[in-house]
Amino acid sequence: MINAAVLGACGRMGSLIIENITCSTDMQLVAAFDIGSIGKDAGEFAHVSNLGIQISDVKDLETVLKKTQADVLIDFTAAGATIVNAPIAAGCGVNLIIGTTGLTPEQRKVIDETIQKNKVRAVISPNYSVGVNVFFKIVREAAKYLSDYDIEIIEAHHNQKKDAPSGTALRAADVISEALGGKEYVCGREGIAPRGKEIGIHAVRGGDITGDHTVLFVGNSERIEIRHMAHSRQIFAKGAVRAAEWICKQEPGIYSMDDVLGL
């Protein structure tokens, strides 16, 4: 049985992840962390029966991870929190599932180096949906055949999302850029801005949109649109739990959802 711990346990993603852990036959929740609601039962936020696991203060992360003998820590919080907590977990020998977006290149480098130094396993991905990762694969193939088309990415999310553009949009741009040998990115346009051969990335924020991503390949007299729409955060939570079950069977190293799904 895999012992799982969850950061941000009282939040929208954390509570869904806990709900999905309770449905797993291979994993059990042994710890849940947040900055508030300390001492309350984690099941209260996941809308399941009492689990007997109290919310622990994230300040006690190291102590609780060691006490509960956690095998894996799932983190869908914020960049400022992940850069602090991921090294602590890795230092405890705990494997990581990181879905936090908005990490700077410098923060990602620190996390990668810590994982490698401590010889733990990690899946790091901007999106844990099976569909989105197939979307990346389709976009990559399309780019190979449409290299002379103008390429634009439009993403839309709820009005509480902190980072823009989304990690998924940036990953889509990376996938296209890799397929085409390198492309410059332009995030939004204003004023006099003649279009070059860049990839344009545009962010929309409003209401309760879970996540929409569209890649447009636009040529003269025609265009192709490849789109993924998320209807529920459940797809991200299910993917995270799937990744956590998978990672504990792998050799130490850093993996992506492509590896988890065999894409």
UniProtKB/Swiss-Prot annotation:
Which EC class, in a word? Answer: oxidoreductase
Q: Which keywords, in A-to-Z order, does the entry hold? A: Amino-acid biosynthesis, Cytoplasm, Diaminopimelate biosynthesis, Lysine biosynthesis, NAD, NADP, Oxidoreductase
Give residues annotated as binding (S)-2,3,4,5-tetrahydrodipicolinate: H158, G167, T168
Carries keyword Protein biosynthesis? no
Task: Write out the GO biological process terms.
Answer: diaminopimelate biosynthetic process; lysine biosynthetic process via diaminopimelate
Q: Where in the cell is it found?
A: Cytoplasm
Does the record carry NADP as a key word?
yes
- Where primarily located? cytoplasm
Which SUPFAM superfamilies does the entry link to?
Glyceraldehyde-3-phosphate dehydrogenase-like, C-terminal domain, NAD(P)-binding Rossmann-fold domains
Among InterPro entries, the record links this protein to: DapB_C, DapB_N, DapB_N_CS, DHDPR_bac, NAD(P)-bd_dom_sf
Q: What GO molecular function terms would the record report?
A: 4-hydroxy-tetrahydrodipicolinate reductase; NAD binding; NADP binding; oxidoreductase activity, acting on CH or CH2 groups, NAD or NADP as acceptor
**Catalysis performed (reactions):** (S)-2,3,4,5-tetrahydrodipicolinate + NAD(+) + H2O = (2S,4S)-4-hydroxy-2,3,4,5-tetrahydrodipicolinate + NADH + H(+); (S)-2,3,4,5-tetrahydrodipicolinate + NADP(+) + H2O = (2S,4S)-4-hydroxy-2,3,4,5-tetrahydrodipicolinate + NADPH + H(+)
Pathway given in the UniProt record = Amino-acid biosynthesis; L-lysine biosynthesis via DAP pathway; (S)-tetrahydrodipicolinate from L-aspartate: step 4/4
Which Pfam families does the entry mention?
Answer: DapB_C (PF05173), DapB_N (PF01113)
GO terms under cellular component: cytoplasm
PROSITE patterns (UniProt xref): DAPB (PS01298)
- Active-site residues, as the UniProt record annotates them: H157 (proton donor/acceptor), K161 (proton donor)
UniProt-listed HAMAP family: DapB
Tell me its family: Belongs to the DapB family.
Q: What does this protein do?
A: Catalyzes the conversion of 4-hydroxy-tetrahydrodipicolinate (HTPA) to tetrahydrodipicolinate.
Entry protein name = 4-hydroxy-tetrahydrodipicolinate reductase
Instruction: Tell me the name of the encoding gene.
Output: dapB
